[in-house]
Amino acid sequence: MAKYAMVIDTRSCLGCGACIAACDLENDTEWRDGRRRTHVPEFFFGEFPNVTRLFVPRLCMHCENPPCVSVCPTGASYKNEDGVVLVHHDICIGCKYCIVACPYMARYLDERKGVIDKCTFCYDNRVTQGRLPACVETCVGHARIFGDLEDPNSEVYKLAKSGVAVQLRPDLLTDPKVFYIRRAVEE
């Protein structure tokens, strides 16, 4: 089995929003109260005129130890054999326990459907067909890299194992499968 992961290079992210649009189109989602499956907040460092702007794309971290799964009372939230954290919409009751449990704030209630929604790495509609997630395929800056974390020939494997790409909040012990290449603020 594969163990899918993503590396996001914050040095290459342009903040253009192509990943957001591709995700919305691919997954028939729409913007609701500022929540989407993926979003790209921007951060500013320094003082004028020496200001650095940084974009940090955020999505579900597809944790190895996902707190959202353990709190789900119906079993709707689960981690599949490829390590992708998903939601069975047909048994989700929209209780929001998983939203509260997620330390990365990656889940939201899709009010149109009354169920929890989040990034799926486009698992069912693309990855199982041998295609890349829509956000990866569309990224203008080539900032998103997707692959098998257990395949030594995979770029994701090489970046994660080299220490170049790091996890957000490793102190939470969730072991997220989305890694980031950091941009030095001084750049």
Go through the PLM ranges and name each one:
Residues 1-187:
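Non-ligating segments of multi-cofactor redox enzymes
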